[in-house]
Amino acid sequence: MNPQKIAVLGPGSWGTALSQVLNDNGHEVRIWGNNLEQMAEINEKHTNTRYFKDVVLDEKIKAYSRLDLALENVDAILFVVPTKVTRLVAKQVAQVLKHKVHILHASKGLEQGTHDRISTILEEEIPAQLRGEIVVVSGPSHAEETIVRDITLISAASNDHDEAKYAQSIFSNDYFRLYTNTDVIGVETAGALKNIIAVGAGALHGLGFGDNAKAAIITRGLAEITRLGVAMGAEPLTYSGLSGVGDLIVTGTSIHSRNWRAGDALGRGEKIADIEKNMGMVIEGVSTTKAAYELAQRLEIDMPITETIYKVLYENLDAKSGILDIMRRETRAENEFININK
């Protein structure tokens, strides 16, 4: 493939790491953000020290604070902004974009209120004549590892196989490998919902529980996010792949995960408002918990772990009491794994 001009919207840890991958593959990368000091740092010092203290970026990666300039003559746009601002940024893109491009996103969350997936937001806000089918790029990936070129394998899902292949071709190299997928709903919901379970896994660690409990929350968490995903139209097999169990393992077991760290702090008795302030980064699992809980209520899907985490986050339930509530639930068979009514 010829070198592409690619705008990466969102200069956070993952947006920065993906920018480096694309740059390594010979593409012209333009990072866009609205923090003028951060954009100047990337351009002048070739660093993004808010997220990576010791990483020097290639000087060919350019940062823009003006969206119209960042999008000028690009071949593709990669959204890596927080879920809560995705719709706003998509509206801005639609206002200044002058030609048809490939649209990809690597964000993980559900919109508050609407419960929309990211691809749904992008489809609603960016006119069809300006884009192809949306591509979801998601899977087990810590930005801290990708930025130092550690091996990473993730999924690229789209309703148009050619669009998924495009994503695969611009990203894949010796350390970063994409697999195509057609289950957009599955890949997208798996990436969003696993953040909830990661908060719970971190809380167990903060409470002092061991590996048995952590394995339990990951496997039972996988069961309930699969139930919700299938109810939304996903294929159950997707949740056993990279974007499902793969992402759940990496996010639910590692200190690199901000969702896990937030849960760990919750388990040690800290309040979520203080945790978010101290971390200084978006914790997608917090807002996703609320959206998923409301969606599960609407669809009548049983999600006991999600419900408990919701009560800890939004109703001041003590985390240890929440664990006991789950353990005291009526016993049942394990083989209701995919049964969306259990």
Swiss-Prot record:
Subcellular location: Cytoplasm
Active site feature: K194
Pathway assigned to this chain's UniProt record: Membrane lipid metabolism; glycerophospholipid metabolism
A GO molecular-function annotation: NAD binding
GO biological process, one term: glycerol-3-phosphate catabolic process
Source organism, top-level taxon: Bacteria
Keywords: Cytoplasm, Lipid biosynthesis, Lipid metabolism, NAD, NADP, Nucleotide-binding, Oxidoreductase, Phospholipid biosynthesis, Phospholipid metabolism
Listed InterPro entries: 6-PGluconate_DH-like_C_sf, 6PGD_dom2, G3P_DH_NAD-dep, G3P_DH_NAD-dep_C, G3P_DH_NAD-dep_N, NAD(P)-bd_dom_sf
EC number(s) per entry: 1.1.1.94
Binding site for NADPH: S13, W14, K108, A143, R258, V282, E284
One Gene Ontology cellular component annotation held by this UniProt entry: cytosol
Catalytic activity: sn-glycerol 3-phosphate + NAD(+) = dihydroxyacetone phosphate + NADH + H(+); sn-glycerol 3-phosphate + NADP(+) = dihydroxyacetone phosphate + NADPH + H(+)
Pfam families, sorted: NAD_Gly3P_dh_C, NAD_Gly3P_dh_N
Residues that, per the record, bind sn-glycerol 3-phosphate: K108, G139, S141, K194, D247, S257, R258, N259
Entry function: Catalyzes the reduction of the glycolytic intermediate dihydroxyacetone phosphate (DHAP) to sn-glycerol 3-phosphate (G3P), the key precursor for phospholipid synthesis.
Family assignment from sequence similarity: Belongs to the NAD-dependent glycerol-3-phosphate dehydrogenase family.
NCBIfam families: PRK00094.1-2, PRK00094.1-3, PRK00094.1-4
Protein name (Swiss-Prot/TrEMBL): Glycerol-3-phosphate dehydrogenase [NAD(P)+]
Species in which this protein is naturally found: Lactococcus lactis subsp. cremoris (strain MG1363)
